[in-house]
Amino acid sequence: SCSLVGSEMCIRDRASILVYIKGKGVVLKEPSVVAFDRDTNKIKAIGEEARLMLGRTPGNIVAVRPLRQGVISDYTVTEKMMKYFIQKALGRKTFRRPRIAVCVPSGVTEVEKKAVEDATYQAGAREVSIIEEPIAAAIGAGIDISRPCGNMIVDIGGGTSDIAVISLGGTVVSASIKIAGDDFDEAIVRYMRKKHNLLIGERTAEDIKIKIGSAYKRPEPDYMEVRGRNLVTGLPKTIKVSSEETEEALKESTMQIVEAIHGVLEKTPPELAADIADRGIVLTGGGSLLRGLEELIAEHTGINTMTAEDPMTAVAIGTGKYVEFLGGYRE
């Protein structure tokens, strides 16, 4: 996501890019997808327009996500995409180059950070600062990170899930795993193929996840009609899918997140662990909207788990505040 304060802005990998302007809130939210023509290597579309092309493009047009799991997979395309979003958010009449803060997952290496920084300068930034995702998420979720007590934040994005224990404005213990929202979609695609011999696209899988996806048994199952291609006959087919099936499809991914939380709790100093048991675990990020995730984590850790008020924008807002109050938090 991407947050911006005055002409200060933060960009980060999510399945979407979010732009936050101080006083205006979120002004732009678009998927980090770029469609380009394979023959001419020219960019055809960026953002929402490109997402609509996912899985629907003629052979010569490819839709790609240049930022995968917080890491640049295609440098030139990332730079062009950032330039596009910066201009769209600020308007073309901007004379001053913005100060941009870039959010990265906690596990990103120095080399990867440098690549993100360089791409941001190339996209037109006057100044670039790099912030770790869990810190921004905690601030955005309304946690006062400057106090000497332990807070656990679990930020489930598109590409990565970041788990961190934060105290006194810094990360004490953290882990970043490459299991998140995109993996939920892929798990649903695999499940439909294996269980129903039905081939569905990424967008359909995302729809299933949003409408009936669940990580924990629901008192009453939800159902939805799903269309795809029957792998046996090769013809289109519609079937009814239940939320219980999504629970089964997502089990491996959700349990990996639970295990990563366990791992971080095991490494947490006892005083801070006691604070977390007291204060609970806070979930942020688009992936945290998966129904039943709070219950699943609470059941396996014995710690009360809640989702931040506006999990989708917590990191964007937190980054904005971080840039504003950098001095205050540092002190």
Listing of model-derived features with the role each one plays in the protein:
Residues 1-2, 7-8, 12-156, 164-282, ...:
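Nucleotide/phosphate-binding catalytic cleft detector across ATP-hydrolyzing
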